């Protein structure tokens, strides 16, 4: 998995090469904020920041995040201390204060979807990455998040087991 950054113009076009770092684990909130500092230092100045992160995010606060609470990354042992650090963490305020600019923090699939939807009618966006992402829009308005990736499918397994990055690695790129 990776944490990426760039700068966009008002039309949503990249005006800087994307910078990327491999997601380090474990990843408490302060460590993620430090990564944002490092990414911002490598990019041109911006007026505001949008962060998309995995999990349930409500009004910029982390309800839950499936991967950042693990000791060694997705599908590894969960660290109860990290769960507590992330629970109800006001990521939006922390990012705004750290980078000294207005910030919005949403689920990563919602951020991707905002750049892809037409704004007409009911639109559902699915993203495939570390896990399955989902965003739902009605006439361009973002609807409350549905964390599909963690839903049980069968035999106690979740969707991420079957169609996330772990499945891609298991099956291969062309499966």
Regions found by a protein language model. Give the residues of each.
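Fold-independent oxyanion-binding glycine-rich loops
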Residues: 1, 53-54, 107-109, 128-130
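Short beta-strand scaffold segments in enzyme catalytic cores
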Residues: 3-8, 55, 132-138
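Short, electropositive alpha-helical surface patch
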Residues: 111-128
């Amino acid at each position: 998995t990776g944490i990426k950054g760039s700068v966009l113009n008002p039309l949503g076009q990249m005006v800087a090469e994307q910078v990327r770092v491999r997601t380090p684990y474990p990843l408490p909130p302060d460590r993620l904020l430090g990564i944002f500092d490092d990414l911002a230092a490598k990019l041109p100045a911006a007026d505001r920041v949008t962060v998309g992160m995995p999990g349930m995010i409500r009004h910029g606060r982390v309800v839950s995040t499936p991967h950042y609470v693990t000791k060694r990354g997705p599908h590894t042992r969960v660290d109860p201390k990290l769960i507590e650090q992330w629970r109800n963490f006001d990521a939006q305020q922390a990012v705004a204060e750290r980078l000294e600019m207005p910030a919005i923090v949403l689920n990563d699939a919602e951020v991707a979807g905002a750049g892809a939807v037409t704004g007409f009618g009911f639109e559902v966006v699915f993203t495939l990455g570390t896990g399955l992402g989902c965003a739902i829009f009605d006439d361009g308005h973002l609807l409350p998040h549905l964390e599909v990736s963690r839903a049980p499918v069968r035999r106690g397994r979740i969707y991420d087991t079957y169609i996330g990055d772990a499945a891609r690695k298991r099956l291969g790129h062309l499966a």
